[in-house]
Amino acid sequence: MLETRFREYIRRFNAEDDTAFDDYLAPDMHMKNGTLEFDGVDGMKHHYRDLIWPHFTERLSVPRFVSDDGRAAIQMHTLFTARRDAPDTLFGAVRAGETFEFDGVIMYEIDDTDRFSDILVAYNSFVHTDLDGNRRDLGIPH
């Protein structure tokens, strides 16, 4: 996968355009993110459309990208900002404005249609910052 194509995926993801999953994921894609695993385009859409984006703005940045014919790897920084107070999210109870910062490495297996067939997320850190500015490393959140 060319870096320009990958960065277009990130742009669409940051715009919360879940049709990007139709264009970039293999129908039987498998994702492992910490202890959370799900399959397929519908699994990815459910995760983000129903569990993440209603509660958080999520912005990805990719300072490093490498690829060959069958895989890509990136360094990823992600900032989640709670949209509103919510008692029950994937990250637990949150208050509007609290943030969660992910730093890690993600490996993508790419099929012959130039779509992601497997996504493996590895955490370096996951940090919660409360409204008083207190930061706490959470390890793997789910």
Residue map of PLM features:
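C-terminal and inter-domain tail/linker signature
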Residues: 1-142
